[in-house]
């Protein structure tokens, strides 16, 4: 009886290890396929990885990001929520979740996710988290908080074009046109040909500058 139990335990351990390795292979294959623009294959591979190793926060995070990139926002939110539940201290996952929630226009939930991300020492994109937090707060009409978040983002990354543009939106909403013009000019100066740079030109026209 004891021998049978031992054999069963060994077999189970080997099966678990085999699944873990298969999941890792599927994950790495999925990342390679994603880099090569093979989105459908990458999606299949990452889904295989999460199926083989459902306890991996990293695999759910990567799958969620790919789904978000493919515009499947609700599915992305579900995967990123699962990842955050598995590893609540993973700051980048919370940031990714906030981004997905913002795409779904769930602004309150996005604010909550960004604020949790900012509290995590593991977060690698603190400037972007504050920038995105500011934008979410702007959409909620919480302009003072939005301004604080965006100015903090710029203190961390003075060339962060999106933060200048979004701060311009915030001060425009607060009826501070001269400050808004300066911010939109700065947005344009950083990179005129980007979407933010071109949008800044239109904002300046709306404020009576240029033509």
Give the role of each language-model region:
Residues 7-25:
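Bacterial Sec signal peptide processing site at the extreme N-terminus
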